[in-house]
């Protein structure tokens, strides 16, 4: 009988949970926006963990690119600290090296949603005007 989750999936899930708590509680850098850890992918040999995050910086909501770059730099500089804290929380022989990546899927989904709404509004206004012209 096959297992539902592999060991790598369980390790990645545990790293994601612990890392989200550590970032929220331990990192106090003002350049760091509200960071959400979306997913973690662990290499087969557990040497690397690719951490995908999204950033909401309330000061720079319009200028999302600069805020996310600054937050990524903060996370990259704190990677050693976060790795050592993860080592205390999760018992592994080797704690993976953390590599942070900006996950653009959320912002892409918002942009696509806005485009769909815009297209629907345009279609409904076009159908309303064509209905008026036929009457």
UniProtKB/Swiss-Prot annotation:
GO terms for molecular function: ribosomal small subunit binding. PROSITE patterns: RBFA. It comes from the Bacteria. Keywords: Cytoplasm, Ribosome biogenesis. Monomer. Binds 30S ribosomal subunits, but not 50S ribosomal subunits or 70S ribosomes. One of several proteins that assist in the late maturation steps of the functional core of the 30S ribosomal subunit. Associates with free 30S ribosomal subunits (but not with 30S subunits that are part of 70S ribosomes or polysomes). Required for efficient processing of 16S rRNA. May interact with the 5'-terminal helix region of 16S rRNA. Belongs to the RbfA family. This is Ribosome-binding factor A. The gene is rbfA.
